[in-house]
Each structure stands twice: as C-alpha cells, then as structure tokens.
C-alpha cells in the first residue's frame, strides 16, 4: 500500500482543487481537513476563529489531521497553517509524501481579494497579510518532500506533475 499524499501551502493556492483531481485519478479518497473541522464543529473556519480563537482551532486541527493521516489511501489537503505544527509536520513527513504548492503572492492576492472566508486576512491590504504569513511559513513549508511551483501551470499540469513524483518515488 502506498503512502498517503498530503498537500500543504498558503490559503488559496489550490490544495483542495488539485487534491480532488489527484484523488480521482489515483482512486484514493480526498480529504480536506478544514472541511472536516467545519462539519464536526458546525461552524466555518472563520467563525471558529471568531468564537473560539486560533489556539482552539489549531488544537482541533492537530487532532483531525493526525487522525486522517493514520487512515489509508488518502489525498489530504492540509489547512494553510497546519504544517507549522511540529507534530503534524513530523507525522506527515514520516507517514505521507508531502507536496508544497507554491504560488507567487501577486497571483495569490488576485485569488483571495474577494474572499470573506480567510480568518487570517484581517487587513484591508491583503498583500501585507499574505507577505507576513508567507514570511512566517515558507521555511517550514520547505520541509515538504516536494516543492511544486504553480506560477505558470494549469491545474491539470500541476496534478500530472504531483502524480508523476508520487508514483515514481
């Protein structure tokens, strides 16, 4: 049995979209950790941050993520900040093949400019928030087994690149 595949990277980079496509092609189950959390708590991630705080969210995220990684035959889309958690990161690196989806901030900003569902984008100037978050996370994201530069690639090409690396390693 092959290892699970995890996708990490900034919010809005396309982890869920790419993950769904990969899971379909590889006949694996797709799991979006944020969606599981929302379903279990019956609140959006945004509302969880507002009502219960980031610390509560991160602890819940850790439990859900570790639980999902232990299951078999999964393509797992991690929350944007999940890889910052040492337990999640180390467990993912030991038990999955991990891919960092990387997209330049200008393109990321275009994707997120009208989003109301991103709890860490609090300023009117999304670019400043993104730069700050990216600076805090990029070194940690780089621990992933593979870095996939998504800048000029269509989703289908990103999917093919990841599947090729996943199957040939």
Model-derived features: positions:
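NTP-dependent small-molecule kinase module
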Residues: 2, 21, 25, 71, ...
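Hydrophobic anchor at the beta1->P-loop junction of P-loop NTPases
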Residues: 7
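P-loop (Walker A) phosphate-binding loop of NTP-binding proteins
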Residues: 10
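ATP-binding Walker
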Residues: 13
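Walker A/P-loop
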Residues: 16
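ATP-dependent small-molecule kinase phosphotransfer cores
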Residues: 33-93, 118-119, 127, 131, ...
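Short glycine-rich anion-binding loops that position phosphate/pyrophosphate groups of nucleotides
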Residues: 80-83, 104-106, 153
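Conserved phosphate-donor/acceptor-positioning beta-strand/loop module used by diverse small-molecule
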Residues: 92-115, 148
